[in-house]
């Protein structure tokens, strides 16, 4: 299956053939250079390189993103965080129909997957009132450049911006007490977790997977710094490992967040925890 995906992508990029050409043109001879390129990609795949890095893109939610080894590969389980954010945006609009602006902060944005998926859905739903402003933050300059490129490709540069920062360090001061939702899929894997040396994780940026401490360092930083930026009643939602839910809720309560809860994914695993700044 991976070999067909790689060939289909090459046909599309090099010959402008649709992927259906794998069937409709299966008797046609291919240029030798393309065959050599395909074999080289196959060899990399056999050595474990993720397909998303080989083809340079990955579908996520309702969008397709350009990806590279500088960023994590967007995963289906992270779509839960997007869906919960969209649900909360709708809740806020229903509770306050006169609200003119909703601000969302995406910490550790990587390729921009979460911010752009949210922005795309809200734009598709013609949410012109209230105005939606989304700011994606990442420490990696390479990730920020890629996220900006994805925003441009998706036509979302008016609504979704990206900036380099270590968590809250370089966030504009005018955002204090004005953010409605802070969302994040931070590095949460324990540095000794054997999964880091298995599968796709071997090829992904280690700093985007683990805090190199205990798996909670980045989560603590996000939660300890969220209150100055959230408005009254604003929410923070964080993806985490399914065995971390109890600890994340404890950290949320320790930082004076209320209405704390964890939400299961389709497999029943608690993968996202949410808390609200008291109003």
Describe the role of every protein-language-model region.
Residues 6, 10, 48, 78, ...:
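Residue-level signal for inorganic ion chemistry
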Residues 9-88:
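Conserved AdoMet
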Residues 16-17, 156, 257:
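Helix N-cap/coil-helix junction residues
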Residues 52, 189, 243:
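Active-site beta-alpha loop architecture of Rossmann-like, nucleotide-cofactor-dependent enzymes
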Residues 64, 133, 159-161, 258-261:
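Conserved beta-strand segments of alpha/beta enzyme cores
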Residues 80-195:
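Conserved SAM/SAH cofactor-binding pocket of Class I
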Residues 186-218:
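Mobile active-site "lid"/loop adjacent to the S-adenosyl-L-methionine
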Residues 213-276:
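Conserved Class I SAM-dependent methyltransferase catalytic core
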